[in-house]
């Protein structure tokens, strides 16, 4: 399906081309987006194919080029064989040691069965009146064996636990590294269809699944396998015929597993894929959070997110059914075979073919073996998840990228002249195959000359830069550098010769100095001394006109720029980016809209820097503001992928063609003299650039921009404060910036989401106390989300079924002890009858346990899936409830939020579902065996139970050790994940700077700390776990020794002894197994504490609040600022507004102008009530905006920003998303007509049902902007806010959009911010901001006459002729 007809090719935005071939959006049902899919679709790819063959219109050769750029490559090998291939020799040694010791530890229980058989013979002999004289000696002798086994099991358990944890972390670390390396190796076209949220999920949640499947659980599997195998070996040696009967359970159990695992695997893969898809949606929502606030779409977006969760829940329930039946079947077979074995064993015993020692030895050996197999079943989910998660990761790792900066192949580019030629280029974006962007396009860019590209959006300008950078390959024609085809050149060496400056420069979270050095290739940087490097940086800064303002910063070149440079203004970021571009003295300089979003003063300064940088090098410039390219050697006018005309500025004016019309549209043809006059005035002015405040650029700053994308990297303020105390206290305006400490030191782990609403100066201790809750509170909090009756019933039935499972152990003990008692009199006439009766008891127990385990697993998992889905939905809505201040904080990045919604919720499984069922099973077991043992024989019961605190204490300290390191591990891994997310979200910048190797190296370094922490944690926690494992055998020794004493004295009989022994020993053993879940419980408790903290935190501006004055419609929509003072909450030291006074009358169209950082966008933020002012008041209709109900108030306002936000879905869905109530088709069409977009929409293949693509990527800037205007108008707002609504558009698009805005402003109060003064000349009143106050106010004509600050802006833009 084509989103654009061929007639509209020229209007397609060429720089936004990420429409997925398999679009992850479904046509809507009325207002809400729909994400419902069939299970088959979701389990395979979770997408709906728009076309069968998107490239069918191209030749086979062209199709191959396109497919190579976007298609995935299925992994040649996946699963555990592939995972284990990442082990080096040390890992192999660790795993080998772990395997051997795991097997050694697994031998302990079967060996115990041998000892138990010998002791059982001695006890039955004593009960039948035989061997009384040697009884105590025999018992003492065999009790010593228990002690020897205990020592061996303790040592082996410790070794296998530690070695597998360490080896698992090391292997998972290499997979993480390989995955990021593969991601950084991909061509840019691959990222056009891959969501940033999906990368984050893969590198966090999925790699955590892999690590979990490689840790101590692997050791437990070898332990269980060894127990199983050795148990049967011992049993066969003791009596093969009897053991063969017991062995019949093995094929039956394997058959059940064989049927269940494939179904479980399929649904696990489906669930993982849906969660990854939902992460992309989360990233899309929170990247544009201000838009959600402005239009009040939180509930709609939450419902859309919930549809992803429902799909994931469906997979989880399907998985639960299979898991429940499989586990139930395993226990049914086990208990059924026990009944069969004792039935046949009694006959063999009666016939004299078997003695009691062999029968009991074989039984215990097989019993222990089968239990060991059953103990694997709860771990199976970890292994299935591990293998499923690895599949997607290895698909990416194995993908062969056609353009790979890591590959050494290709001719190395060294000394070049810099001549670029595009010859007969045919180009189409792989994710938009229906649009031919360049058609037989040819252009020569001479060496050392400036070539400028102009034309409408979608005409192919940015594509040319992408081809020169070799971000893409054309499907036809060639791109030459000095006569050599780019495809024959080494990619990295090619990009080392090129520097790119983009419209939205990306700076990294480090110092100004480091950001500039990133422009130097490593081959050069490594050869420079410290002094030479500093000289280069300073020279580059001076060339970029950045040196003077850098020297006024708090730490000068050592000043940290903040995440994505948000502490810098737009002009400052741009000039740092230019310095970064020119430091390597590139032969080729590419400038893509480098000044379009700047105010006039910044533009003049930046343009001078660009003019300086362009001298003596090949330069390609894209510009919508023609004033910036009038001096170019060759100006190329591009339209619909073809060159319309080219020549110098004057030559093209003489032609009076397309270029002349563009010039006329911008009213620049007569402005050269005035432009020169302004530049001369700037030359005469002092070189120090006036800075209102450090980074106080509320148009370009992430903190204040109304449509700023969320930053994707995180910091940890605690670690940071320590560093600041040591050396990095930054003082500015005589104030210590402790509260912006998280921006001063880069690349540190983020605070968890739970910490996000805390005051910056709170200590680590106070933060920890705020979040830390005990296990009971966490359990109550998680299950407080059980809401529906079916969930309550499932939870109660699941608990009851789990308790029945737990009660099996004491029932088994009572049956076994009484069964053993009949062996004391083999000559009894009713012996065989008694054997038959007890065999039936075993069969009944088998049937009960089948239903109990099946129902327990299914019911608990059903309830868990519902609860976790609801908690995830609740957390999503809670995050959407937070105010803008919350998202301004550096720790609340998109990466952190996406990770929290994925991994934190996943962690809650440790206190819910099957794990909770296991807890009730164990609790029931402990209580019931205690009651049974005390009722049967209180003396032996008390002595044996007195040892249980040893196991409990060992388990407690293991949990405590894990608890202490879990927080450090979580923060450290989140740091590395956030760094990876930041780098991949800025992949074009990373690629253009050729920084892939550096990013990869930094990421590898960031994984070292968590690896070290994991090793230390394993050494501590493994000690306590091993103690819990070994002490079981000591308890056996004590029980047999004391029991023998009681029996020898005649106080106990054999029934009493074996009832107490089996009940307590096996019961305590199972209690010890629960501590194997301690790591999961720790993670769940920490996650629940953070989510609970966030849930209970109330934002200052609360959209859930019902308080405040209700307003259905504003009366006059008059706006007044009275002595307003304001500082952003995260930058209290910087005053943005300093006593602002202004009045906007009802129905007026007013404009705010001024330099960056003067407070313009801040006023819109205050009108929208994104923030509350510090002093003074903002009044609308004479009422303080604080007194209105926030939701009712925002319904009266509509916002159109510089970067319009569109979501995945159809055009219709995106438009009606802005409606404050249900709207009719006619109302929607009327809004579109006013926005000048209706006719265009009708021309689309599916009209209003045409898909927009991710973030509206299939539409041009002008088209997206007009849809955003329609979305604003459908609200029928009383107040319309326009924040740089046309600044990033080309002249044609700007004209069309401006006409739509003019129509939209009729009959309502309109506030517009604009750098292009031509768009606001007709305003009723123009307010000129300067330093947070109004410097001038009046109409355009009045302000021009005053010859003040506004007049300077007019002259700078050549508008005084108007």
Swiss-Prot record:
Q: Which residues are on the Cytoplasmic side of the membrane?
A: 1-91, 375-788, 1073-1362
> Could you tell me which residue ranges the ABC transporter domain spans?
420-665, 1119-1356
The Basic and acidic residues compositionally biased stretches are 33-45
Question: Which one GO biological process term can you cite for this protein?
Answer: xenobiotic detoxification by transmembrane export across the plasma membrane
The primary site where this protein sits is: membrane
Alphabetically, the GO molecular function entries are: ABC-type xenobiotic transporter activity; ATP binding; ATP hydrolysis activity; ATPase-coupled transmembrane transporter activity
- Region feature Disordered, mapped onto this chain: 1-45, 748-768
Question: What are the UniProt keywords, alphabetically?
Answer: Antibiotic resistance, ATP-binding, Membrane, Nucleotide-binding, Repeat, Transmembrane, Transmembrane helix
Q: Which domain of life is it from?
A: Eukaryota
How is this protein situated with respect to the membrane? Multi-pass membrane protein
> Which PROSITE patterns does its entry note?
ABC_TM1F, ABC_TRANSPORTER_1, ABC_TRANSPORTER_2
Gene3D superfamilies named in the record: ABC transporter type 1, transmembrane domain, P-loop containing nucleotide triphosphate hydrolases
- A single Gene Ontology CC term: plasma membrane
Taking every annotated instance into account, which residue ranges of this chain make up the domain ABC transmembrane type-1? 95-385, 795-1083
Q: InterPro entries annotated for this entry? A: AAA+_ATPase, ABC1_TM_dom, ABC1_TM_sf, ABC_transporter-like_ATP-bd, ABC_transporter-like_CS, P-loop_NTPase, Type_1_exporter
Tell me the function of this protein: May be a transmembrane transporter of the mating factor, namely P-factor or M-factor. Confers resistance to leptomycin B and to several other antifungal drugs.
Similarity section:
Belongs to the ABC transporter superfamily. ABCB family. Multidrug resistance exporter (TC 3.A.1.201) subfamily.
What name does this protein carry?
Leptomycin B resistance protein pmd1
